[in-house]
Amino acid sequence: MAEAQIDSQLLDGARRALVRHGWEGATLQRLADEAGVSRMTLHRRGVSREALLAALGEQLEHEYREAFWPALTAPGTALERLELALDSLCDVADRNLELMEALGHAERDLVFHERKRPALTKQVFTEPVQRLLADGVADGSLAVEDPEETATVLFNLVGHTYRHLRAGHGWSPKRTRKAVIDLALRGLVAR
């Protein structure tokens, strides 16, 4: 079968359908309705729910890469740049809060986790954090034994906790960022 033809109109519609109906309720008909196309158009373009999920995952990968870039290229210690990266992670989480809440665990796993078990978070999401952790070990600002594993822990610690406190507890972005990032960084600072 040919690769699905998914444009920004379909992705935006998929986001709306997922937010409104959740993954289980986001039928192809609802996805088509939210995108302003017919279900037959989705069929002709080779679009399935799974293809839309994969495309949304690619969109998230791009958003995280773009968000982390300034922290990778900024001046300062690795600790300062890591704080900037974690703040950027919170920015992406805020922009995608409703989408992430609408996806089930299995769908989030497909987007973020490696397939093997035990799994790390996909490198496309954690590689920038891993780089900053390794830089911190090199410049003495961070105490980290395994940057690769710590990057997965940190990405998930900040991402999940931030999302939960924002969506589940109704905390403001400012309050949540300070609480989560300060706590996460305290465990990494070289003493």
Regions found by a protein language model. Name each.
Residues 3-6, 10, 147-154, 173-177, ...:
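Short amphipathic alpha-helix in the helical subdomain of ABC transporter nucleotide-binding domains
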Residues 91, 123-138, 156-157, 163-191:
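C-terminal peripheral helix-coil segments that are non-catalytic and often amphipathic
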Residues 93-113, 167:
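Amphipathic alpha-helical segments used for helix-helix packing
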Residues 5-9, 13, 17-51, 55:
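Helix-turn-helix
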Residues 13-17, 88, 92, 157:
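Short amphipathic alpha-helical elements of helix-turn-helix/winged-helix folds
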Residues 62-65, 112-139, 148-152, 163:
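Amphipathic alpha-helical packing segments from all-alpha helical-bundle domains
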Residues 55, 69-95, 150-154, 174-177:
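Hydrophobic alpha-helical connector segments
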